């Protein structure tokens, strides 16, 4: 039996330093990074997504960054395909693939080799979106609870995009989304070596607030204004990302800048908490406290040491 190739995964909640740690690990072990961030795939959305600059990448090849325009559809199935192709290329160059980011579903789709049940049906999706607008997303969530209670319990009643996707799967296949992916009787594609970065909650929240302030100073308002002027409206999935929806609301006059910043910090803290809840369920992840490791360089050193022992 062929031993699957190793895949190093570095994940954790936002603002824990995953990007910097990943770059340091890649430099130490001859690796290339495959981004696992659902917002970094969009071109022109740089400040609000905390994309690393060319100088910050320090010569480390990065994949799955700047893949599509903000008005193009991009989903986990497409991510899985492109990430898989990138990993094959990295392995072919005899280098180490590192999956780095905080989008749990993207990571799981690669590590667990998801089999996606059905392709998106544009007409069905439009009908479900119209129903959500007419009756409210909570009503769709209640319906999902009838046909797929497992998925309904996992999703927030206002998570319209994922609720609609789960209903799409059910209506098209007759099978609840919670029964996918089915990877039984299949050999694993990779041997995942997974690390989670974290830190004391108060420290993490202060880092989140400092990062939001830094984004504002770096020109986040100008970035969002430019996107809106190019015709990328607030209804787009990309424009509903953290930082973009709050600043867009400010630019429409719904919020003052101070209010938008306050809400963005609050929403990011809540997002980090949800990320941590998601990742804590994965027993494969080895957790590292970045502060206890002495910062990103120390955390990278710990990871490299663990990889060498595998």
Swiss-Prot record:
Cofactor: Mg(2+)
Entry annotated with the keyword tRNA processing: yes
Superkingdom, natural source: Bacteria
Record bears the keyword Transmembrane helix: no
GO MF term (any one): tRNA dimethylallyltransferase activity
Positions of region (Interaction with substrate tRNA): 37-40
Family statement drawn from the similarity comment of this UniProt entry: Belongs to the IPP transferase family.
Protein name per Swiss-Prot or TrEMBL: tRNA dimethylallyltransferase
Organism: Desulforudis audaxviator (strain MP104C)
Taxonomic classification: Bacteria, Bacillati, Bacillota, Clostridia, Thermoanaerobacterales
């Amino acid at each position: 039996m062929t031993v699957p190739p190793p895949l190093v995964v570095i994940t954790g909640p936002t603002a824990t330093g995953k990007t910097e740690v990943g770059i340091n690990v890649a430099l130490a072990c001859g690796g290339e990074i495959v981004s696992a961030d659902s917002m970094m795939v969009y071109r022109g959305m740089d400040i609000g997504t905390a994309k690393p600059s060319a100088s910050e990448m320090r010569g480390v090849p990065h994949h799955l960054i700047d893949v599509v325009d903000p008005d193009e559809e991009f989903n986990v199935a497409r991510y899985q395909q492109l990430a898989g192709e990138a990993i094959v290329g990295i392995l072919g160059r005899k280098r180490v693939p590192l999956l780095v980011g905080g989008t749990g579903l993207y990571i799981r789709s690669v590590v667990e080799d998801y089999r996606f049940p059905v392709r998106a049906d544009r007409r069905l999706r439009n009908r479900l979106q119209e129903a959500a607008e007419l009756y409210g997303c909570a009503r769709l969530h209640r319906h999902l609870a009838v046909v797929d209670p497992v998925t309904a319990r996992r999703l927030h009643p206002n998570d319209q995009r994922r609720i609609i996707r789960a209903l799409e799967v059910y209506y098209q296949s007759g099978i609840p989304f919670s029964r996918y992916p089915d990877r039984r009787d299949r050999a694993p594609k990779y041997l995942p070596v997974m690390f989670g970065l974290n830190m004391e909650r108060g420290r993490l929240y202060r880092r989140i607030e400092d990062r939001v302030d830094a984004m504002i100073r770096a020109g986040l308002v100008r970035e969002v204004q430019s996107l809106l002027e190019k015709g990328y409206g607030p209804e787009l999935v990309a424009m509903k990302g953290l930082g973009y929806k709050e600043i867009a609301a400010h630019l429409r006059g719904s919020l003052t800048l101070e209010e938008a910043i306050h809400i963005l910090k609050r929403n990011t803290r809540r997002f980090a908490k949800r990320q941590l809840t998601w990742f804590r369920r994965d027993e494969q992840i080895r957790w590292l406290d970045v502060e206890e490791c002495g910062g990103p360089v120390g955390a990278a050193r710990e990871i490299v040491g663990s990889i060498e022992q595998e």
